[in-house]
Amino acid sequence: MNTNRITAVLLAVFIVTMFFSCKNIRKKPTTAITFDTIVVARQIPLLQNDSTLPYADVDFKFIYPVKFGTPEDLARLQQIFVGTFFTDTQYDTLSPQEAVDKYLEKYIASYRALSSDYYSDKSRLPEGETPVWYYYQLNISNKILFQNDSLLSYAVEYSDYTGGAHGSYRIVYYNIDLNDLVTISEEDLFIPGYYKSLTDIILRSLMKKYNVTAPDSLLTKGFFTIEDIVPNNNFWMDNKGLHYTYNQYEIAPYSMGPIDVTIPYEDLKPILKPDNIIERFFPNKENKKSERDPI
């Protein structure tokens, strides 16, 4: 009888424990993110009703979150994505689709305002010739580079042509702390006064990449000046390190394209804050399973 009673008590304790454990599991907030994409591919004639005129090719590929945590969390995450995609805070109060529509509307109005200049330039050309510099292009896209339960890193790429000798291209990175839903900058990672030390680390990394032994030797590789090579806050993060990019004309000529440099966390240890968030984001930096392929 005592044995049966003990068994019954233990079974009851087990059931109660499992019940509350399951409740806790269900209540635990999820950091899983579901994404959707808005794609725009339009050819905008300089005048609305004249397809014989120059036009602007406009292409957007906007990846944005549609499911994440609570409704408030999702709204905040979408706000960050919208604001960083269009690089203007006037859009971050809009839904992703509203922001795309508004940006496109403003771009079309700005492009078509050039029509009077087009006819003025055309009148100065030999008959039958067209001012081809009014053929414009605009491409904006983003892609997810890294994601785990605490961190989301992504890139926004811009390329455009507005009639000059060549188009322009730039890539900008953003890192979001998924726990606090804020973007991360160098100041969040490094101790006060980090700037000079980080500059030296970046410089050494570039010297290694370009296989030179002295900073001035980078000038022979095409870099403008050594003084231009400084931290620029344009980095993304994964469990390997920080990945910096310097865009065209930032530290080198257009012909060299964007300059990329990766810095392992081991090299950054002396300037990381004592309570640095790197350890929180990557409790086991050797674990490659938290990485994901770019979207």
Where on the chain are the PLM-derived regions?
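Bacterial N-terminal signal peptides that target proteins for export
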Residues: 1-10
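Compositionally biased amphipathic helical and low-complexity segments enriched in hydrophobic
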Residues: 11-12, 269
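C-terminal motif of bacterial Sec signal peptides marking the signal peptidase cleavage site
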Residues: 18-21
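Compositionally biased intrinsically disordered regions enriched in Thr/Gly
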Residues: 23-295
